């Protein structure tokens, strides 16, 4: 029951979505500043320097990562620096452009981004998107995304022709607003995972008044922020039907599984599956032994 880290910074996007109303503007003058911010963050990760990591990482991301590690009953910051996945070097990648809205920015690259792949492993060409937030006038690294292009000949042709209009797609846009800062968590009695089926709905799940996540028209598992404790726990589920959806008949189902540690068997401690239309908001208590 161990959840991947890489700072919560690596998100793999399988396909391009060009339907997006672009609000950020190109700003090539930021490229050197952003690359310097990324290299400083990367150096902190390589050397295991927690002070430098705190100085180079957006604060909202710091808190999210620390909470995620502690929620798994793992030591912080040791677990952060033990992550086996490396952050890629920018050398050898082709810069495609920088987008900024003033408080958030992205810098996108094309090429064979190496995340510590074993020697001899073939690395395909992909798009690497670095995300940054501006705090107190200083750009801080937030996360990175790998956009897989596979054999998409159209994208490859656009890149060869220096047509980077696909950067208008949602995958390449900076954050539209600054993310909220989570409250810190303490080490829980048990690690917990939420299993969610939100087919045709937007579902928000709160466990012990902490947001586990917001899920729209998908089936997914997610680490419960703050875990669960022995004895009584509370869960709130908010469900909102989506105007258009695909993937089957609309339904909402939520289950919580808990385990003493990452190596232990997880047991279901809560299950919600309404027979009819789910209520807009329900709150239940559940006991963990």
State where each predicted segment sits.
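Surface-exposed, charged secondary-structure patches
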Residues: 74-129
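Beta-strand-rich recognition domains
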Residues: 29-32, 39-46, 58-62, 66, ...
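Phosphoinositide-binding peripheral membrane targeting modules
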Residues: 221
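Short, flexible loop/turn segments at beta-strand junctions in immunoglobulin-like
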Residues: 224-228
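Hydrophobic, helix-prone linear segments
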Residues: 1-95
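Short beta-strand segments within Ig-like beta-sandwich modules, predominantly Fibronectin type-III
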Residues: 211-217
């Amino acid at each position: 029951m161990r959840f991947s880290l890489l700072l919560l910074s690596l998100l793999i996007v399988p396909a391009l979505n060009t339907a997006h109303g672009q609000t950020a503007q190109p700003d090539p003058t930021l490229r050197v500043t952003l690359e310097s911010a990324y290299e400083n963050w990367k150096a902190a990760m390589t050397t295991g320097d927690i002070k430098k990591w705190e100085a180079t990482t957006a604060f909202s991301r710091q808190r999210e990562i620390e909470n995620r590690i502690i929620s798994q009953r793992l030591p912080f910051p040791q677990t952060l620096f033990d992550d086996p996945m490396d952050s890629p070097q920018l050398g050898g990648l082709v810069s495609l452009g920088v987008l900024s809205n003033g408080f958030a920015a992205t810098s996108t690259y094309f090429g064979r981004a190496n995340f510590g792949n074993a020697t001899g492993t073939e690395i395909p060409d992909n798009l690497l998107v670095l995300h940054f937030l501006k705090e107190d006038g200083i750009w801080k690294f937030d996360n990175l995304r790998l956009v897989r292009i596979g054999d998409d000949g159209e994208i490859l042709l656009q890149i060869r022709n220096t047509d980077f209009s696909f950067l208008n797609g949602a995958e390449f846009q900076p954050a539209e607003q600054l993310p909220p800062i989570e409250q810190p968590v303490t080490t829980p009695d048990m690690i917990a995972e939420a299993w969610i089926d939100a087919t045709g709905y937007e579902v928000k799940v709160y466990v012990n008044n902490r947001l586990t996540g917001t899920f729209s028209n998908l089936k997914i598992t997610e680490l419960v922020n703050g875990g669960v404790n022995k004895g009584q726990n509370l869960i709130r589920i908010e469900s909102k039907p989506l105007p258009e959806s695909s993937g089957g008949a609309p339904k909402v189902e939520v289950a919580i599984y808990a385990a003493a540690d990452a190596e232990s068997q997880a047991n279901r401690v809560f299950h919600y599956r309404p027979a009819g239309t789910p209520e807009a908001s329900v709150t239940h208590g559940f006991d963990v032994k």
